[in-house]
Every structure is written in structure tokens, then in C-alpha cells.
Amino acid sequence: MASSCDDALVSDLEAWDRRTASQLERAYLAAGAGPGGSGSSETSEGAWRAKRQHLCVPMDGDGTWLDVGCANGHLLATLPVWCAERGITIEPHGLELLPTLAALARFLRPELADRIWTGSVMTWTPPRRFTYVTALDDQVPPGRLADLVARLRSEFVAPGGRVIVSSYTDSNGAPRPLFDDLSDAGYPPDGRIHIDRPRRHPLLSAWIDA
């Protein structure tokens, strides 16, 4: 029975990864460099910063950082710059599900090529631990958030580090109750960020200390 359950869970994750690939790969590759190739519908750098610079808030000390789902690597290039403005040094690393996007990220950021890996967050084995790990709640199927956070805490994050989970929606999506979802999963946030935006759904991020 346990083996059957494990097989079902693996199949569930593999199907979710295939769904993610089918939804994102073509659009992200077509967008190429810049914010568009990292999932932003607005391609200006100002809009990109407004959407993502809040991720610097939980990075309150020097350290290494893994971006799960790094796409074309644009956040790997920009977030350390924003942190440096606050006097904090962040060494970026990336994990990307799609080999084509990981290859694009390595091409666009050759200085980071040896720090950008390809794999699924629920099966990939990290070569080291990181001070900070950022991930999205939709990188696993609904109901699997607890598994995602547990794996990131046990295998990805260094002692004293932080798992930072965000929930983003497009203009037609309904906001997800990220903070409640984390609490229900057994991981009440140690910190929360809720940014309201005119005529748009809020930006939500939360962190869990390791």
C-alpha cells in the first residue's frame, strides 16, 4: 500500500511538472531576455523591480541564495543588486525545471552558468545548502505545499536560513490565501509581506526560518 501511495505522489508531481512546462515554456522562450522571460507581463525594469524587490526584505544578512524556478535568470541578476543597495551581499544560484530555459539563463548570464541547475524541486538533489531559498506555491500541485516546504527546509536551506514562499497571480487569477495555506500546512510564517496594488491582486510572500 505504501509503495502504491508513493507511486501516486510521484505521478502527481510529474503530471504537474508537465503542465507547468506546457503552460510556460513557449512564452518564456519567446520573451527571451529581461523581465518577460521571467514571467512578467510588464517588461520595463521599473515594473519588474516593483514586483520583486520585496524579496530582499527577508534577506537581512549576507549569504547564498537559490531561486527555485529561475527561468531566464533575470531575478538572479537583479535581486543581488537591490540587496547590495542595503549593504547586503547575496550570491545567487538558480534551479530551473525546463532544460531550455536553464540553457537560456546560462547563455544570458555566463558568469552564473555553473550555478544554474536543471531539475524539479521535489526530486532534484542540491549540491549544497543555501542561506535563502525562494519558491512559489504553485510549483507543486494543490495540497502539496507542506511537502514543498518540508523538503526545502530539510534538504535545501542551511541552519539559520530561510525558506521564502511567494504567491503571484495574473490579472485574471484569484489571489491565493498563502499565509493561511502555510499555517494549515503546519508552517505558520515567521514573516509576512502583503503589498496591495491598484486594480491588481496583492503581492504575497512569507518566510519560514530553518
Predicted regions and their residues:
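Conserved class I S-adenosyl-L-methionine
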Residues: 63-71
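Class I SAM-dependent methyltransferase Rossmann-like catalytic core
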Residues: 21-54
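Class I SAM-dependent methyltransferase SAM/SAH-binding core
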Residues: 74, 78-113
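Conserved beta-strand signature within the Rossmann-like core of class I S-adenosyl-L-methionine
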Residues: 160-168
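A short SAM/SAH-binding and catalytic strip from SAM-dependent methyltransferases
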Residues: 132-145
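Conserved SAM-binding strand-loop segment of SAM-dependent methyltransferases
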Residues: 111-121
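A short glycine-rich, Lys/Arg-flanked "PGG" loop and its adjoining helix->strand segment in the class I
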Residues: 146-159
